[in-house]
Amino acid sequence: MPLSRLIIQQFRNIKACDIALSPGFNFLIGPNGSGKTSVLEAIYLLGHGRSFKSALTGRVIQNECDQLFVYGRFLNSDQFELPIGINKQRDGTTEVKIGGQSGQKLAQLAQVLPLQLIHPEGFDLLTDGPKHRRAFIDWGVFHTEPAFYDAWGRFKRLNKQRNALLKSAKSYQELSYWDKEMARLAELISQWRADYVAQMQSKAEQLCQEFLPEFHIQLKYYRGWEKETPYQQILEENFERDQTLGYTVSGPNKADLRIKVNNTPVEDVLSRGQLKLMVCALRLAQGQHLTEKTGKQCVYLIDDFASELDSQRRKRLADCLKQTGAQVFVSSITENQISDMRDDSGRLFHVEQGVIEQG
């Protein structure tokens, strides 16, 4: 469902704004520091309950204010509007409302508003540690496998309890009770992840090939322990090592999506512009897979669209985004940089010192 309306109050340098949106492309144009990225950040907060730029709530609440508020309305296929909103206070208190009902969970926000973010720091998906690629996989599993969220939460709690017990356990038998349930959850989570990667892999590799035809892209899922060995056996065999280290070494919390081009890690081969194109291809593949599996459309947030991309690559990305039929928010310094995306159905907003006006 596309956002039809967005209200932001006391968020960074935006005192207040209330804008009607296009179900297609929405362009935010303004100089650096004007507040255009803050609009994207507010939408991300509405879908995730947190900022993509700061983990500290106090940093996104406007100076001398005690709280922020972001509110959106969605228009479904029956033209019915669903309101959602999030209020965050400086003391860390968060209130979520969906359809006028308060006390909703952040995970419910994510279900209502599936978001894909492409921003200048997004290279970490490819160049940093496995946690970023686990999050990439888990976004897809969360939106396509209803039981995943609770199962993953239970596994993490059990893993934390097991790590605490490792410090005092005299023998493996003291952990066997926890390990039985941990193993069941680990195998389940791993299978969901493997199935998801297998389902979206061909689309991801196809888009990567379209964006980077000079390279052969390879994606391979690693579940976090030896492929042919049951997880409960791994836990028992590694008990002494885990106890020495003080934590459980193997498991789904160590999973990774290994991405190579021409059999070489991507960070050793691709330029920054090529890395950005690959991130775009992977995010678009996820969005397309979501639509095919569930009928839902992603909302795409693209910050600093032109950075790292020449005009030819910008056009290639613009064409692919248009083909999705999804709602897209794009920030850019100049209108010229987004000329390949513009048409009569899109809306353009000028942003200056936190004030947003339709162009």
From Swiss-Prot:
One of its GO terms (biological process) is DNA replication. It is found in: Cytoplasm. Pfam families: SMC_N. ATP binds at residues 30-37. Keywords: ATP-binding, Cytoplasm, DNA damage, DNA repair, DNA replication, DNA-binding, Nucleotide-binding, SOS response. GO terms for molecular function: ATP binding; single-stranded DNA binding. It comes from the Bacteria. GO terms for cellular component: cytoplasm. InterPro entries: DNA-binding_RecF (IPR001238), DNA-binding_RecF_CS (IPR018078), P-loop_NTPase (IPR027417), RecF/RecN/SMC_N (IPR003395), RecF_2 (IPR042174). The RecF protein is involved in DNA metabolism; it is required for DNA replication and normal SOS inducibility. RecF binds preferentially to single-stranded, linear DNA. It also seems to bind ATP. Belongs to the RecF family. NCBIfam families: recf. This is DNA replication and repair protein RecF.
